[in-house]
UniProtKB/Swiss-Prot annotation:
GO terms for biological process: biotin biosynthetic process. One of its GO terms (molecular function) is biotin synthase activity. It is an enzyme of class 2 (transferase). The keyword Nuclease does not apply. PROSITE patterns: RADICAL_SAM (PS51918). It holds the Pfam family BATS. This is Biotin synthase. It comes from the Bacteria. Residues 53-282 form the Radical SAM core domain. It catalyses: (4R,5S)-dethiobiotin + (sulfur carrier)-SH + 2 reduced [2Fe-2S]-[ferredoxin] + 2 S-adenosyl-L-methionine = (sulfur carrier)-H + biotin + 2 5'-deoxyadenosine + 2 L-methionine + 2 oxidized [2Fe-2S]-[ferredoxin]. [4Fe-4S] cluster binds at residues 71, 75, 78. The gene is bioB. Coiled coil: none annotated. The lineage of its organism: Bacteria, Bacillati, Bacillota, Bacilli, Bacillales.
Amino acid sequence: MKQVQTKRDWKKLAYDVVEEKMITKEDAIAILEADDTEVLEIMNAAYIIRHHHFGKKVKLNMIINTKSGLCPEDCGYCSQSIISEAPIDKYAWLTQEKIVEGAHEAIRRKAGTYCIVASGRRPTDKEVNHVIGAVKEIRETTDLKICCCLGFLNEDQAGRLAEAGVHRYNHNLDTHANNYDSICSTHTYDDRVDTVQKAKQAGISPCSGAIFGMGETIEERAEIAFELQRIDADSIPCNFLVAVKGTPLEGQKELTPVECLKVLAMMRFVNPTKEIRISGGREINLRSVQPIGLFAANSIFVGDYLTTAGQEPTADWGMIADLGFEIEECAL
């Protein structure tokens, strides 16, 4: 039987990264363009980097959708957008009591980080105060790390969230700057970068990632990883487009499981010390190879996403245990 020869020494590349030698954009593209038969070797190499920085720990995050739908923005991938016809639940803000209850559910699900998310372009000062009230109570009664994702922020709002005890702020870049106008016209790529920077300047750990599979090229996919490196995102959620019926991108071809694995590996090579989270689309796009993704990533969401269902927490706990990995509770 003819043996398949690998094109690159992926392990050597991984050890170079461990020794703090940054890979090039050409290296990142090579990972994404590698033959599918090489994917296990690539994931094994990515694990060398992952294990060096994070061992066998897996961080769990839980989302609460505190305000659903009713968003004036026209992001083509989003079922909560004003232009979406997807049949989702739409509701205004949950009470502070409900948000606090969600924190205790996060603990029951063994999550260490609780993500308070609200749809919309940007929060009003009154809405920020609403979140702050819940955050203060959660901080007083739990050891959870708190992440917020509320849309665009001004400097004052970012500062008040930091003062209240918000550890992390999520604002994804979503896609490559070259591709942004094709998915959204109501704000710009630079608007998103600006909010990440405002959160960081306020002393909040920045969380920013992308949604892969929205028409970006392979080269742009690699450049997204380097852009996230440039803005110094501490946590990088890797989402994979779920082409929801009723959204403008409903006909978009979704990435294959192997393509998703290559994205995760490439992201680990480019951002070796950062928390890399397998996020939206994990169950739908990775399917039966979900466990392999954790050889590059070190974080997942547990439970449901904003408008799509996740798998049962017990399934995630079992997957982590079956890999010989351990849940890292209450840690950023």
